[in-house]
Swiss-Prot record:
Source lineage: Eukaryota, Metazoa, Chordata, Craniata, Vertebrata
Gene this chain is encoded by: Cyp3a9
Family per similarity comment: Belongs to the cytochrome P450 family.
GO molecular function per UniProt: estrogen 16-alpha-hydroxylase activity; heme binding; iron ion binding; monooxygenase activity; oxidoreductase activity; retinoic acid 4-hydroxylase activity; steroid hydroxylase activity; testosterone 6-beta-hydroxylase activity
Name of this protein: Cytochrome P450 3A9
Reactions catalysed, as given in the entry: an organic molecule + reduced [NADPH--hemoprotein reductase] + O2 = an alcohol + oxidized [NADPH--hemoprotein reductase] + H2O + H(+)
GO biological process: alkaloid catabolic process; estrogen metabolic process; female pregnancy; lipid hydroxylation; oxidative demethylation; positive regulation of gene expression; response to dexamethasone; response to estradiol
The entry's keywords: Endoplasmic reticulum, Heme, Iron, Membrane, Metal-binding, Microsome, Monooxygenase, Olfaction, Oxidoreductase, Sensory transduction
PANTHER family with a match to the protein in the record: CYTOCHROME P450 3A5, CYTOCHROME P450 FAMILY 3
Family annotation (CDD domains): CYP3A
Main location: endoplasmic reticulum
Functional summary from the UniProt entry: This isozyme seems to be implicated in olfaction. Active in the demethylation of erythromycin as well as benzphetamine.
EC number: 1.14.14.1
Recorded topology in the membrane: Peripheral membrane protein
Length: 503
């Protein structure tokens, strides 16, 4: 039996030509950085340098920064990605040329109605949505929303106290994941849930399903390797996000809006109500108002952007405080002095908490919420002698920047004093980017910080945290997607008092 098929010469020629064309398709973009004299790891056909991510984004970025310096080139499949760490170039990308050249983030494939979400929308549509949503995130609006968040800190303390009384190691992700989910569903959808104690709640189940995202998911990989498939998937109504989940949230928002329009009494002030109000505000005189579908898209993206990041950031803070008891004690002293007798925090009180601010900032330096920032170059451009071709993804490796010893002496050390008022002027704003910078920074930054600080205030009023034998020291990070611990972060929770106010 012949192992080699008995094809005609024409068939063999066609097969060879097809294979050559396929190879050229999978490699033709891989010479861009070499031509420009930009160093970087060697790409593989079709895959580019994507296999290096198996070791984890963050360590890979640190490795490249150390090996190649301020500039290096990667390939996510066929997509050229230029990593930059020079603060002047970063400023140009995020601020100076944001509107003209670096407006948009990368398109990661078919996302359905979430194309209308502020984090994903592009160009003029993004500008319109940003203008309509910006009044929602002012300090005045957040102050009005503060009581909603504060009520969930009581639930947080109760859940934390249960772990303390049982004397077992407590999973920070379980506790803060529930808190984060409860706050986001309350503020984005107007729905009150107790996700830790009611895991079967439909909202809880749908949110958890929404957040099951893997960078090595077949659909994600297929559009990364073959981006021309994205329009086909969109035409077939295929999305990266489960359709039943999006339909559930869409129905929920529509029902909630209808109920609120019928009710005459004053509505509670949450993101959903503020977006509904924006449909009739003066802002829409200069911008087309948010549609109902756009409101759904923003509500869903708030969950996607806020749940994992907030719960992980809070877990990181308490891990660092547990292994640095002197810093934990100093922060508790500040909290006790600000509001004795375990009184609830107020919005204005949190603004005056200098050491709390320092601790949160230093935690976000070590574990930035956005481990990478990205912008797509819309036209050929040269910045500080670096030529960037149209279509290149410009990537800022925040995690690596925050560990650069040139800007951060002993970068692996946890030192809140780096962010004291005395030292603030020494910090380059383009080397500290936990929420990005410029016109397209994280619109929810103030909300995220408020959410984190009020939670920390309440738990540190009532508890102290200690490492236990199950605590992973030093902490290892997950190799999958978002910046989070590799294993569940377990700590011993010790009650500071026999009575817990408000819980």
């Amino acid at each position: 039996m012949d192992l080699i098929p008995n094809f005609s010469m024409e068939t063999w020629l066609l097969l060879v030509i097809s294979l050559v064309l396929l190879y050229l398709y999978g490699t033709h973009s891989h010479g861009i950085f070499k031509k420009l004299g930009i160093p970087g790891p060697k790409p593989l056909p079709f895959l580019g340098t994507i296999l290096a991510y198996r070791k984890g984004f963050w360590e890979f970025d640190k490795y490249c920064h150390k090996k190649y310096g301020k500039l290096w080139g990667l390939y996510d499949g066929r997509q050229p990605v230029l990593a930059i760490t020079d603060p002047d170039i970063i400023k140009t990308v995020l601020v100076k040329e944001c509107y003209s050249t670096f407006t948009n983030r990368r398109n990661f494939g078919p996302v359905g109605i979430l194309k209308k979400a502020i984090s994903i929308s592009e160009d003029e549509e993004w500008k319109r949505i940003r203008a309509l949503l910006s009044p929602t995130f002012t300090s005045g609006k957040l102050k009005e929303m503060f009581p909603i968040i504060n009520q969930y800190t009581d639930m947080l303390v109760r859940n934390m106290r249960q772990g303390s009384e049982e004397g077992k190691p407590t999973s920070m992700k379980d506790i803060f994941g529930a808190y984060s989910m409860d706050v986001i569903t309350a503020t984005s959808f107007g729905v009150n849930v107790d996700s830790l104690n009611n895991p079967q709640d439909p909202f809880v189940e749908k949110v958890k399903k929404l957040l099951k995202f893997d960078i090595f998911d077949p659909l994600f990989l297929s559009v990364t390797l073959f981006p021309f498939l994205t329009p086909l998937f969109e035409a077939l109504n295929v999305s990266m996000f489960p359709r039943d989940v999006i339909d559930f949230f869409k129905t929920s928002v529509e029902r909630m809006k209808e109920n609120r329009m019928k009710e005459k009494e004053k509505q509670r002030m949450d993101f959903l109500q503020l977006m509904i109000n924006s449909q009739n505000s003066k802002v829409k005189d200069s911008h087309k108002a948010l549609s109902d579908v756009e409101i759904v898209a923003q509500s869903v993206i708030f969950i996607f952007a806020g749940y994992e990041t907030t719960s992980s950031a809070l877990s990181f803070v308490l891990y660092l405080l547990a292994i640095h008891p002197d810093i934990q004690k100093k922060l508790q002293d500040e909290i006790d002095a600000a509001l004795p007798n375990k009184a609830h925090a107020t919005y204005d009180t949190l603004l005056q908490m200098e050491y709390l601010d320092m601790v949160v900032n230093e935690t976000l330096r070590l574990y930035p919420i956005a481990g990478r920032l990205e912008r797509v170059c819309k036209t050929d451009v040269e910045i500080n002698g670096v030529f960037i071709p149209k279509g290149t993804v410009v990537m800022i490796p925040t995690f690596a920047l925050h560990k650069d010893p040139h800007y951060w002496p002993e970068p692996e050390e946890f030192r809140p004093e780096r962010f004291s008022k005395k030292n603030q002027d020494n910090i380059n704003p383009y080397m500290y980017l936990p929420f990005g910078n410029g016109p397209r920074n994280c619109i929810g930054m103030r909300f995220a910080l408020m959410n984190m600080k009020v939670a920390l205030f309440r738990v540190l009023q009532n508890f102290s945290f200690q490492p236990c034998k199950e605590t992973q020291i030093p902490l290892k990070l997950s190799k999958q997607g978002l910046l989070q611990p590799e294993k569940p972060l377990l700590l011993k929770v010790v009650s500071r008092d026999e009575t817990v106010n408000g819980a």
